[in-house]
């Protein structure tokens, strides 16, 4: 083990310097401005990275959709099923690295960052095995759940072609966190843009020219995930910028499995409980009168908020990385300033986006549909969607702060209560008993988001940052010896 790492381990035993809480003078001085600039420089390119990754699936869906209603319906159903049962779970589990790797990097335990990344790859690959069995039996499951047999059959074939992409995704997510937690966003930006630019013509060729049809969209997505993983993996292994955090493959990766899952499982619960609640709202919309209209409009609203959420995620990633780094280094005041800066940036961003949506609400629906009834309904929903953007922006950054601090278990309990004990019951009551239909469903789920945001704000506002820095340093010392 290198001298640098040994020195870092020893430093973890030193007492943390006690500092007073952040004051208005700190916010007026250059500390706040400097941190705000850091967050912007991190979040701006990270937003492009997240959007490029998000658009891979959208491009496949759009091209498959032009093949006909059956292809679109089956691909949409398969994508939704795979997101709920697979991709969301992988993303959630990988968020454990926001705490572990971020704080290790801040504590200058650079080699541990690489070891933790390998541990996460191994664990996520294992998780993919049972998920693969579920996907291979998707047709049977969908028919059992009452789906049309022809749609279920095509959806099952589509999901089977996504399996290679699932395993690639299980490696890609830890790699993304590896670079993100070191604030190395440029490799992510260049790689994501390159893969996206290649994905578009590749998807077109496989869908329209190869005879594969809708399966071509799934195969193109799997190939792009694999290519993305290969490029980032090569950079990790061979780039000089990664020399400090690069670690050789060894039995050491198995030592951290318990610690990884200790944070990964509540991380997955935190992410999936929120993600699944919105999918449940779409399912409930199918039980309403005129289900085609209600489902279409709610899908447009959900697609809009999901796209904009890419920007929220970028700010959340910046906040999570900066806070975990500063806590790992024992800098409690700096971590506190990050919170103020990140929330300030989020407020500016959500005001711009929500105002833009309100101003353009009458043309908003034309982006997604040419049906007048759908366009008018979307315009009616626009004010509610604007409120959703505000809530998503605030809770997204607060969730990033929670991951940076290692509060995933708290976030999981909050999301469980806010959405499943509060939001969804209200949504069902408003939609089916008060007869507000799709509007009621959306109001209900946003009631859950309001409670989620308030509780996360309360937890963050009551935080003793000196104690959090102590916990981070003690966690590093306990996990990696002294």
From Swiss-Prot:
The keyword Hydrolase does not apply. GO terms for cellular component: membrane. The chain crosses the membrane at residues 39-59, 77-97, 124-144, 159-179, 188-208, 218-238, 268-288, 297-317, 337-357, 381-401, 416-436, 439-459. Keywords: Membrane, Transmembrane, Transmembrane helix, Transport. One of its GO terms (molecular function) is xenobiotic transmembrane transporter activity. It is a multi-pass membrane protein. Its main location: membrane. Coiled coil: none annotated. It is found in: Membrane. GO terms for biological process: xenobiotic detoxification by transmembrane export across the plasma membrane. Belongs to the multi antimicrobial extrusion (MATE) (TC 2.A.66.1) family. This is Protein DETOXIFICATION 13. The gene is DTX13.
